[in-house]
Amino acid sequence: MSDTQAAEPLAEPAAEPTGLNRWALRIEYDGTGYLGWQKQNDGTSIQGLIEAAASKLVRNRPVPSITAGRTDAGVHAAGMVIHLDFPDDAPIDARQIRDGMGYHLKPHRVVVLETAKVGPEWNARFSATWRSYRYTILNRPARPGLMENRVWHIKRPLDVDLMQQAANHLLGPHDFTSFRAVACQARSPIRTLDVLNIHRDGELVMIDTKARSFLHHQVRNMAGTLMMIGSRQWPVEKIIEILEAKDRCAAGQTAPPEGLCLMDVGYPDDPFNRS
């Protein structure tokens, strides 16, 4: 799964075999300098760091992981949810997982926020019913200093009202072919956007979106298109033409990864008991 690609709504997988204890983890990370979530042979990935840290808690035995969303290189997460399968003979509890992994993850910018024991049928990917993302634009003449690698810097003034007018046309179910990466492997381009809100806080323009799942690069491609409309390079009505074109070349550029952050993942029965 990429920065915005989530699970296809497939049949529920069978429960894992016994001999393992499944734990849900909520984690945050700064994606700068990493190769994204998925393990790679030629660099450091978030998944590789997580599994290595977990393995050290059980005498270097393998601890496989599944994530709610595979973020791309440079993309951040404030509330990613994963699950880990620890050997059932390992004497380990929630605090030991959080604090022990926190110790072994240093000095990397990857943190375990919460842990919760779950049943073998619970799956971080397939049990999720929604994912939410935020794309952040720094809208000012001066380049970012403190927020470098966390925002997309746009000098031209952005009209958030125009951006919201365009965004409203993307709500609900649509064929998002124009907004998915050419290499997207999803079987269907149909997705349903539940939320797509744009607001300004001083020099920051935030694009917040929520859906059950997203296509590869969908959020970043929507951000690139909305930027063109907010900067008055395209009219609001252009968004309708782009949707109807079903052609990636019709939409705006793919916004850079550093502005994107996975904010949260939702489940019918939240393992972390959040209200």
From Swiss-Prot:
It comes from the Bacteria. SUPFAM superfamilies: Pseudouridine synthase. InterPro entries: PsdUridine_synth_cat_dom_sf (IPR020103), PsdUridine_synth_TruA (IPR001406), PsdUridine_synth_TruA_a/b_dom (IPR020097), PsdUridine_synth_TruA_C (IPR020095), TruA/RsuA/RluB/E/F_N (IPR020094). The active site is at 72 (nucleophile). Its EC number is 5.4.99.12. HAMAP family: TruA (MF_00171). PANTHER family: PSEUDOURIDYLATE SYNTHASE, TRNA PSEUDOURIDINE SYNTHASE-LIKE 1. Belongs to the tRNA pseudouridine synthase TruA family. This is tRNA pseudouridine synthase A. It comes from Gluconobacter oxydans (strain 621H) (Gluconobacter suboxydans). The lineage of its organism: Bacteria, Pseudomonadati, Pseudomonadota, Alphaproteobacteria, Acetobacterales.
